[in-house]
Amino acid sequence: MQGMASVVSCEPWALLGRGALCTKARPGGGPAAGTVVAPGSPDRGRPRSRNSLASQDQQGAVTSGTAHKALFSRDTNFLQEINRKQEAAPTGTRHKAKSQGLVTFGDVAVVFSQEEWEWLNSEQRSLYWKVMLDNYRNLASLGLCASQPDMITSLEQGRDPWMMKRKMRKGQHLDLKAMQETKEFPPKDLSEETLFLAVLRKQLLPHRPKCSMVRAAWEGGAVFTTHRGLKTNSGLARDSPAQLVSAQRSFCKSVTWENCGDRGSVGQQSVQEAQDLLPRQDSHAERVTGRTWSTKLECSTFRDQDSECTFERNEQETVTPNRAFSEGRDGMCIESGRWFHLNSSDERSHNCDSGKSFSSNPVVVKETGICSGKKLFQCNECKKTFTQSSSLTVHQRIHTGEKPYKCNQCGKAFSDGSSFARHQRCHTGKKPYECPECGKAFIQNTSLVRHWRYYHTGEKPFDCIDCGKAFSDHIGLNQHRRIHTGEKPYTCEVCHKSFRYGSSLTVHQRIHTGEKPYECEICRKAFSHHASLTQHQRVHSGEKPFKCKECGKAFRQNIHLASHWRIHTGEKPFECGECGKSFSISSQLATHQRIHTGEKPYECKVCRKAFTQKAHLAQHQKTHTGEKPYECKECGKAFSQTTHLIQHQRVHTGEKPYKCLECGKAFGDNSSCTQHRRLHTGQRPYECVECGKTFKTKSSLICHRRCHTGEKPYECSACGKAFSHRQSLSVHQRIHSGKKPYECKECRKTFIQIGHLNQHKRVHTGERTYNYKKGRRAFRQTAHFAHHQQIHSGKSPAHHSLPSTSNPVDLFSKFVWNPSSLPSS
């Protein structure tokens, strides 16, 4: 038979120690033709296939480095003849022939680890490249390679072969037991970590796990720990330390894995790991240091099975003075259940379904904390824990007050970069997050999520454990929880008032500063709160987005809708602790409580008068400005308040909606009806603290108090005379104007006051209302009656001279008609 094509396979130590190559045994057994056998070792070469170690009966020959070119002679007729025989043979025979040695590139490919590759010198590496490329070309010329392997592509590109180690999971491994039997060992300077991993993989290879993901990582060198709480079986033969050479030291560690896809019986394997398979060389003590690095990841995929899967990656790292953790490591993302590769460099080599990217080993520990719920970083000040060190750093700025991120436009500072980035969108107007339902855009993604839940889905996944109230986001829940705890962590430095929310404090501080940063573009009115501006803009647009489902009434603000809804339900959740009175709106309760406390926080800057409500202050200020924006369309009369206009319009319409239940009398306004009812009840709730006199109305008490104080706030602009009552000023001004609005229907006589008209009417009717009991004399006016009583009491009348014309009331006593003064007939 002519010379056969020789395809070379080599063991790692063949290149390391002796510079020789071993050949693949031919199907017939014995050394291949045309090969040079090394003296003293006719059958000790133990080549391994990619899938399993070579059988004992396969023999190889070792050739010298100088004669390796003789191995590359080709004889295509030989292999083609074998192919024809196998195709013509029966099925059983064909399979047997295949098992006996039809060569593939996987059978002859040798993969070095990084540690092994580093021990090769430049000559050995060049020899390795040449042999592997020649082997591939030989097989390709025979048609035994359908496509170019990745390993050859890498070699042609000049990359080191150990980079392809994980892609070729079933690489060649050492058979330590076989080497012991043949008394043949690799050179002592071979990396002991390489030997250990080789033995470990060989021993556990028949017991690979069934789970595809777990098996893929296992074949790359990963080690798994069992699920806690699941049934396990143990049954793996253990390598005794006696099987190793005397110089070897060992330690034991349980290495287990399981079938993640099956809750049933879980196979558990245990092996003895050899830590120091070979004695260390002193010359290499500083260069090679074996270290074990573990990364534990908790698997949330199997929590519904009452179990916990942890992935532990034990790996021997070679650490040099200038290089550490150079080899990548495998891991699994717990959120996505996906395997990824870890590089020690800063580049991120994996993106999982949860949006996280992983780089170096410490980052994996950080991601482990997120997935498993563990919090690894604790603040020394408040003991709060975080899953990321960066979160702890940002949190610590709360205690230190540090705000390193400053806006160049407004000077506002922030403690974290994300808040600073969001703030800058306020200046740029950029709103990258748009609602797909209504098209509304937001600065923050969280704002879009809250909007989506609140307006479109109605989802409220966050429940309060105290009252059961649900919220669409955790921020709203946390703020609500402060109602139950009473916590008010935000305090104003000026007035020391505390608030539950930081936004409330910010708005409150504008009261002290007078800042109103939000301005309406239509009317230029400014507001201290953005929500107030939004509500105000609905006045111009007429928008009322909040609609009552019961009656269909629409409102500009959500809080107004909530208050209105309580009209239908009758709910009054806000109760006064002093008198027990309930209210449907919290602001009404706050206003009511000022009655008990006497607090009047709203003060007029002109007259220093204080009010309990801001609306009352606004109404009062119109008395100083003279502003009367509300005008009656019927008569043109103007009013300072809209309620006064409504009451006035009832004069034209004749509407009297308020009716007395006692006498049936109707009134145009509620206050008049309330005052009228006190005539029936005799109630006089307003008492003067000076003299004890009581009054039915509060306005009557206020006017009465001026008798004690002498206050006369109403002054005539024509003559300068002052009055204690506004009505007295109005009557007096008619003297200057000559206006007499009250006319007698009998004689057409006119009067300045309605009281004068009533007195005049008694002249026509002859009515005498006031009777004197002693003399049985009657009088039409109280003034006449009082003057007459002074005559009987012996007191001289107070005024004998003509009355002053300044008060027209005094003139009537001199001109009143008296029938007794007429001469008798």
UniProtKB/Swiss-Prot annotation:
<feature type="compositionally biased region" description="Low complexity">
    <location>
        <begin position="33"/>
        <end position="42"/>
    </location>
</feature>
<protein>
    <recommendedName>
        <fullName>Zinc finger protein 28</fullName>
    </recommendedName>
</protein>
<feature type="region of interest" description="Disordered">
    <location>
        <begin position="26"/>
        <end position="65"/>
    </location>
</feature>
<feature type="zinc finger region" description="C2H2-type 10">
    <location>
        <begin position="630"/>
        <end position="652"/>
    </location>
</feature>
<feature type="zinc finger region" description="C2H2-type 7">
    <location>
        <begin position="546"/>
        <end position="568"/>
    </location>
</feature>
<dbReference type="GO" id="GO:0008270">
    <property type="term" value="F:zinc ion binding"/>
</dbReference>
<keyword id="KW-0238">DNA-binding</keyword>
<dbReference type="GO" id="GO:0003677">
    <property type="term" value="F:DNA binding"/>
</dbReference>
<dbReference type="GO" id="GO:0005634">
    <property type="term" value="C:nucleus"/>
</dbReference>
<feature type="zinc finger region" description="C2H2-type 4">
    <location>
        <begin position="462"/>
        <end position="484"/>
    </location>
</feature>
<comment type="function">
    <text>May be involved in transcriptional regulation. May have a role in embryonic development.</text>
</comment>
<feature type="zinc finger region" description="C2H2-type 6">
    <location>
        <begin position="518"/>
        <end position="540"/>
    </location>
</feature>
<keyword id="KW-0539">Nucleus</keyword>
<feature type="zinc finger region" description="C2H2-type 14">
    <location>
        <begin position="742"/>
        <end position="764"/>
    </location>
</feature>
<feature type="zinc finger region" description="C2H2-type 13">
    <location>
        <begin position="714"/>
        <end position="736"/>
    </location>
</feature>
<feature type="zinc finger region" description="C2H2-type 1">
    <location>
        <begin position="377"/>
        <end position="399"/>
    </location>
</feature>
<keyword id="KW-0805">Transcription regulation</keyword>
<feature type="zinc finger region" description="C2H2-type 8">
    <location>
        <begin position="574"/>
        <end position="596"/>
    </location>
</feature>
<keyword id="KW-0479">Metal-binding</keyword>
<feature type="zinc finger region" description="C2H2-type 2">
    <location>
        <begin position="405"/>
        <end position="427"/>
    </location>
</feature>
<dbReference type="GO" id="GO:0006355">
    <property type="term" value="P:regulation of DNA-templated transcription"/>
</dbReference>
<feature type="zinc finger region" description="C2H2-type 11">
    <location>
        <begin position="658"/>
        <end position="680"/>
    </location>
</feature>
<dbReference type="Pfam" id="PF00096">
    <property type="entry name" value="zf-C2H2"/>
</dbReference>
<dbReference type="InterPro" id="IPR036236">
    <property type="entry name" value="Znf_C2H2_sf"/>
</dbReference>
<keyword id="KW-0863">Zinc-finger</keyword>
<feature type="compositionally biased region" description="Polar residues">
    <location>
        <begin position="51"/>
        <end position="65"/>
    </location>
</feature>
<dbReference type="InterPro" id="IPR001909">
    <property type="entry name" value="KRAB"/>
</dbReference>
<dbReference type="InterPro" id="IPR013087">
    <property type="entry name" value="Znf_C2H2_type"/>
</dbReference>
<feature type="zinc finger region" description="C2H2-type 5">
    <location>
        <begin position="490"/>
        <end position="512"/>
    </location>
</feature>
<feature type="domain" description="KRAB">
    <location>
        <begin position="103"/>
        <end position="174"/>
    </location>
</feature>
<dbReference type="Pfam" id="PF01352">
    <property type="entry name" value="KRAB"/>
</dbReference>
<keyword id="KW-0677">Repeat</keyword>
<feature type="zinc finger region" description="C2H2-type 9">
    <location>
        <begin position="602"/>
        <end position="624"/>
    </location>
</feature>
<feature type="zinc finger region" description="C2H2-type 15; degenerate">
    <location>
        <begin position="770"/>
        <end position="792"/>
    </location>
</feature>
<dbReference type="Pfam" id="PF13912">
    <property type="entry name" value="zf-C2H2_6"/>
</dbReference>
<comment type="similarity">
    <text>Belongs to the krueppel C2H2-type zinc-finger protein family.</text>
</comment>
<feature type="zinc finger region" description="C2H2-type 12">
    <location>
        <begin position="686"/>
        <end position="708"/>
    </location>
</feature>
<keyword id="KW-0862">Zinc</keyword>
<feature type="zinc finger region" description="C2H2-type 3">
    <location>
        <begin position="433"/>
        <end position="456"/>
    </location>
</feature>
<dbReference type="InterPro" id="IPR036051">
    <property type="entry name" value="KRAB_dom_sf"/>
</dbReference>
<keyword id="KW-0804">Transcription</keyword>
